[in-house]
Regions:
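Hydrophobic core register within WD40 beta-propeller blades
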Residues: 21, 60-63, 103, 140-143, ...
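Terminal intrinsically disordered, low-complexity extensions flanking WD-repeat/beta-propeller proteins
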Residues: 304-361
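Conserved strand-to-loop turn within each blade of WD40 beta-propeller repeats
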Residues: 33-36, 73-76, 113-116, 170-173, ...
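WD40-repeat beta-propellers
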Residues: 39-42, 63, 79-82, 119-122, ...
């Protein structure tokens, strides 16, 4: 346990670092966005590149793969939509005045965040902006969306305010904001962090947002009332990435650890160590926690025991993103390569320290 393994396949077609990796809803394809200004589509069946998307005038910061289209955003201030069969650019969404950091496609809407201090909403089928969310005092980074159907139980006399759902944004100004998509108005400002908000995760049924910050904390918020519910304090460095799984929050940090917290109490129930640099990416899959780090390694931990099960070595620089499909781990790195790893045989039980039942859904 903990030993290194060789990659099943190394895909090195990009000529610059890979900034993001997105898995299609059916798990059959992967999309990578790169510093070389292109995005590439890959088959998960054989690891072959099946489409190249060219057109951005600067590096690709983020990407999202849907069933019928691929979406990319770039430092060239634009978002683009691509045909996954032909590689043709179907739409260019213009309006941001600086680097576009993130995109999120949901309910036939495209949301984007930018260094220009705004988030924007577009119809997926049109190139015209439908809403601008303005109010942050600095760069806007992470995005999350709560659809109207997720808010149904909370709707009351002001149903029209929530009719388009809620958008949650995090910013380097130290706040997160909750926006009414239908009107573009700020519904709540979530204040409490003393550093930039780098990541967020949304519990839509519970109307709760979890934010991670350079102030080394994770915070839980009621997105309807704006109330700060809990502060998770044990990290010793910036919180870089978050994932919410079965009412447990996993947080990856510059302190070289991942921590597992009970979402409803804020209790830290597990710390995953062994990283030699910051934890830059994480993904939970079938009882295993996969992590990517600035030390150029990916790791697999048993989530019940915290035991390190496997180390995946081969990348030359930081791993920026990871995905898992069936029995294969996909890692994308600033070294420009996408690597595929066999993860069969990881669920051998280690010494068990069960999480209290109240932390499970």
């Amino acid at each position: 346990m903990g030993g290194g393994v060789s990659a099943l396949r190394v895909c090195a077609d990009h000529r610059g670092g890979i900034n993001w990796l997105s898995l299609s809803p059916d798990g059959q394809r992967l999309l990578t966005g790169s510093e070389d200004g292109t995005a590439r589509l890959w088959s998960t069946a054989d690891g072959q590149c099946c489409a190249l998307f060219q057109g951005h005038e600067s590096y690709v910061t983020f990407c999202q793969l849907e069933s019928e289209a691929a979406f990319t955003c770039s430092a060239d201030h634009t978002v683009r939509k691509w045909d996954v069969l032909t590689g043709q650019c179907l739409a260019v969404y213009r309006g941001h005045t600086s680097i576009v950091n993130r995109i999120l496609v949901a309910d036939r809407q495209l949301f984007s965040s930018s260094y220009d201090r705004t988030a924007r909403c577009w119809s997926v089928d049109k190139e015209q902006m439908s809403r601008e969310f303005r109010g942050h005092r600095n760069c806007v980074l992470p995005l999350a969306y709560s659809a109207p159907r997720d808010l149904h139980s909370a709707l009351c006399e002001r149903d029209e305010d929530m009719a388009g759902g809620l958008l949650v944004t995090g910013s380097t100004d130290g706040t997160a904001k909750v926006w009414q998509v239908a009107s573009g108005c700020c519904h709540r400002t979530l204040r409490g962090h003393t550093g930039a908000v780098l990541c967020l995760a949304l519990d839509t049924p519970g109307h709760t947002a979890f934010t991670g910050s350079t102030d080394a904390t994770v915070r839980a918020w009621d997105i309807l009332s704006g109330e700060q519910l809990r502060v998770f304090r044990e990290h010793q460095g910036s919180v870089i990435c978050l994932e919410l799984v079965n009412q447990q929050v996993y947080s990856g940090s510059a302190d070289r650890t991942v921590k597992c917290w009970l979402a409803d109490t804020g209790e830290c129930v597990r710390t995953f160590k062994a990283h030699r640099r910051s934890v830059s990416a994480l993904k939970y899959h079938a009882g295993t926690l996969f992590t990517g780090s600035g030390d150029a390694c990916a790791r697999a931990f048993d989530t019940q025991s915290g035991v390190l099960q496997r180390v995946f070595r081969g990348h030359a620089f930081v791993i920026n993103c990871i995905q898992v499909h069936e029995q294969v781990l996909y890692t994308a790195s600033h070294d420009g390569s996408l690597r595929l790893w066999d993860v069969r045989g990881l669920r051998k039980p280690g010494p068990r320290r069960p999480v209290p039942e109240r932390g499970r859904s």
